Amino acid sequence: MPLEAVVYPQDPFGYLSNCKDFMFHDLYSQEEFVAQDTKNNIDKLGHEQSFVEQGKEDDHQWRDYHQYPLLIPSLGEELGLTAIDVESHPPPQHRRKRRRTRNCKNKEEIENQRMTHIAVERNRRKQMNEYLAVLRSLMPSSYAQRGDQASIVGGAINYVKELEHILQSMEPKRTRTHDPKGDKTSTSSLVGPFTDFFSFPQYSTKSSSDVPESSSSPAEIEVTVAESHANIKIMTKKKPRQLLKLITSLQSLRLTLLHLNVTTLHNSILYSISVRVEEGSQLNTVDDIATALNQTIRRIQEET
């Protein structure tokens, strides 16, 4: 756009006055501009410094502290402001580091407790295995054919019961008495310990005269069962080849012979037998075993 010159009439007497007014007006406007510019710069500096301080607080949580340069050095020099030295204000230690240290200690304590528990349990199992090995060595191998804990403990129980039976069967020999002549043995003193040997027999001989002989049992029979093992006590009259026939009958009943003890007193004989009930056997209870043995003893005595 072309500039056009505009000519104003001038008062010959007011030229100096107008020039003076223009000069004062120009100085006043320049002072207002400088003041406004200074105020704007101060506000801008305060806003930038607050933004820098907020950024520093956020960065303190995740990174190390370093010296930051002054963002607006020229403006700070003009306004007489100084830069904030970050190194003069060391940051406080953050709680997250302490928490991590405490968590590491807790993990170490938990790991130590776990290792201690494992060591105690290992020692307990080792001691239990040693005791089971000693217990298994004290009894015949037929009582504990398997090496597990239940078999060893069950076999030990059966072996202790068998030893008790053997001890009771040896009592008649210890308490044997003789008549005054010394050549004969009292029959009553020998039979008495045999009768005391049976606690709860399933079959018993009838001594009363009013009971028919056919209804009485030919032997005293008592059976006890522990799991798959059975302890049998039989007291009867001695017969030839009776023991061989009894063992054969036990095998036919699927009763495996584990231990046998025989005690004789004059015309009587006491069998202490330990057997194992095999799988597939029809004898599942003490009454079944006692009934089968009663029939076997009756048949043996009738054959002889």
Curated annotation (Swiss-Prot):
Compartment(s) where it occurs, according to its Swiss-Prot or TrEMBL record: Nucleus
UniProt key word Ribonucleoprotein: no
GO cellular component: nucleus
Comp. bias intervals (Basic residues): 92-104
Tissue specificity comment: Expressed constitutively in roots, leaves, stems, and flowers.
Gene Ontology molecular function, alphabetical: DNA binding; DNA-binding transcription factor activity; protein dimerization activity
Chief location category: nucleus
One of the protein's GO biological processes: regulation of DNA-templated transcription
bHLH domain sequence ranges: 112-163
Keyword line: DNA-binding, Nucleus, Transcription, Transcription regulation
One Pfam family matching this protein: bHLH-TF_ACT-like_plant
CDD domains: bHLH_AtFAMA_like
Residue span of region Disordered: 86-107
Lineage top rank: taxon: Eukaryota
Quaternary organization: Homodimer.
Listed name of the protein: Transcription factor bHLH94
Source organism: Arabidopsis thaliana (Mouse-ear cress)
